[in-house]
Amino acid sequence: MSVYGLQRLYIGGGYVDATSGKTFDTFDPATGELLAQVQQASAADVDRAVASAQEGQREWAAMTAMQRSRILRRAVELLRERNDELAAIETRDTGKPIGETLAVDIVTGADVIEYYAGLATAIEGLQVPLRAESFVYTRREPLGVCAGIGAWNYPIQIACWKTAPALAAGNAMVFKPSEVTPLTALKLAEIYTEAGVPAGVFNVVQGDGSVGALLTGHPDIAKVSFTGGVETGKKVMSLAGASSLKEVTMELGGKSPLIVFDDADLDRAADIAVTANFFSSGQVCTNGTRVFVHRSIKDAFTQKVLERVKRIRVGKPTDADTNFGPLVSAAQLDKVLGFIESGKAEGAKLLAGGTRLTDGHFGSGQYVAPTVFGDCRDDMKIVREEIFGPVMSILEFESEDEVIARANDTHYGLAAGVVTENLSRAHRAIHRLEAGICWINTWGESPAEMPVGGYKQSGVGRENGITTLEHYTRIKSVQVELGRYNPVF
């Protein structure tokens, strides 16, 4: 018996059975318990979801922006009313501590929907005078049906981030959550329907990468928004272009640098570094896993980091006192342990952790100890590749020019941060760092108002912020002639 029973697809405002005849399992990563069997969508199911979305989108786009705004605000109210229920499901599905999901995942998702609900009425065109009796005006019109493909680390937050601007602009969305964490996207669909979103405007299809490929290549989908790894992102972009020149937004991986200068407040710097590496058990795309520390303060900084690592409370995710849970799956555990062994083999000095936790109740879950490596080099695998787990690499530097060059020596460019008391240096360094999301004397916050996205191979386009609405609309230009038409022939 599973905890949540059989999970179906959500199409046309309600649950429907998949036609594939296939299911997959989702497990609690803390206990190994079967949470649910989930029906996998077929090509016919994807077609049905897209057709339903087309029908719903026509009704949704015909509403006034104020009507759409009110409905989205109602969805926000429902998300907040059901915060505890949704957080409990998210904790079971992802392994995140309940204190984290209660305070972050649903809260930040609802904030983004509220933000775009407020902007729905601000989507405007321009009027451009040409001459006394002629002018041009522009309209921002919805794209139509968009596809959203989510990642497993922030299931409901990512679903909110992708749907909010799409729906605010009058689009519909067919969403595929990660098959590793498939549960809460269905709850979001229920909430949208209860709030008054027309049937079909938000549909959920379940499955692995093959279902994502069906969405990406579908001729009736106008845009794909994808969150995931770089190599998968390249495939998404290629298929989206080859199929119908779809617009794409992609938030991909990172290997982000955190630079601690010699004048930094060491307690603050250590707090930031620990948060930037061990929040959500290190499974955050923006984590600052390359920690560059000025040589003169490296030993003192490292000692403060290790003191804080000892205070991390690893435990059952459902316990309120826990602030560090398991990794999301056995596959992710194996990947992280492989990187740890690579770090040892390449000569990094293991300062903390480095092992799987197996004592007591840890034995049935996917737990790895918070891990810190010192004496790291830029050419090490743990320094160059995204691990997506709780592994910090500490590197030392001597000069600002040197550390900026080393920090930028990567094909990633998602995030970066500096810790310094010198405001001029802080801004100078940030302006030279090749990253789309940057922090000064802090780390990790991504409010609704802040555009989120990467440079280089860390992504295309942005999520959140006003600019994102531009990528869910298309501009129509209209010339109006009030005077006499002068024929050419």
From Swiss-Prot:
Swiss-Prot/TrEMBL catalytic activity: betaine aldehyde + NAD(+) + H2O = glycine betaine + NADH + 2 H(+)
Modified residues (Cysteine sulfenic acid (-SOH)): 285
Active site residues of this protein: 162 (charge relay system), 251 (proton acceptor), 285 (nucleophile), 463 (charge relay system)
Binding positions for K(+) 2 per the UniProt entry: 245, 456, 459
Residues involved in NAD(+) binding: 150-152, 176-179, 229-232, 253, 285, 386
Pfam families attached to this UniProt entry: Aldedh (PF00171)
Domain of life according to the entry: Bacteria
A GO biological process held by the record: glycine betaine biosynthetic process from choline
Site description Seems to be a necessary countercharge to the potassium cations, residues in chain: 247
CC cofactor: K(+)
Stored SUPFAM superfamilies: ALDH-like
Binding site for K(+) 1: 26, 93, 180
The protein's Enzyme Commission number: 1.2.1.8
Pathway field: Amine and polyamine biosynthesis; betaine biosynthesis via choline pathway; betaine from betaine aldehyde: step 1/1
InterPro entries reported for this sequence: Ald_DH/histidinol_DH (IPR016161), Ald_DH_C (IPR016163), Ald_DH_CS_CYS (IPR016160), Ald_DH_CS_GLU (IPR029510), Ald_DH_N (IPR016162), Aldehyde_DH_dom (IPR015590), BADH (IPR011264)
Keyword terms: Metal-binding, NAD, NADP, Oxidation, Oxidoreductase, Potassium
Note describing how the cofactor binds: Binds 2 potassium ions per subunit.
GO MF annotations in UniProt: betaine-aldehyde dehydrogenase (NAD+) activity; metal ion binding
Entry function: Involved in the biosynthesis of the osmoprotectant glycine betaine. Catalyzes the irreversible oxidation of betaine aldehyde to the corresponding acid.
Classification via HAMAP family: BADH (MF_00804)
Quaternary structure and partners: Dimer of dimers.
Family listed: Belongs to the aldehyde dehydrogenase family.
Family matches, as PANTHER family: ALDEHYDE DEHYDROGENASE-RELATED
UniProt protein name: Betaine aldehyde dehydrogenase
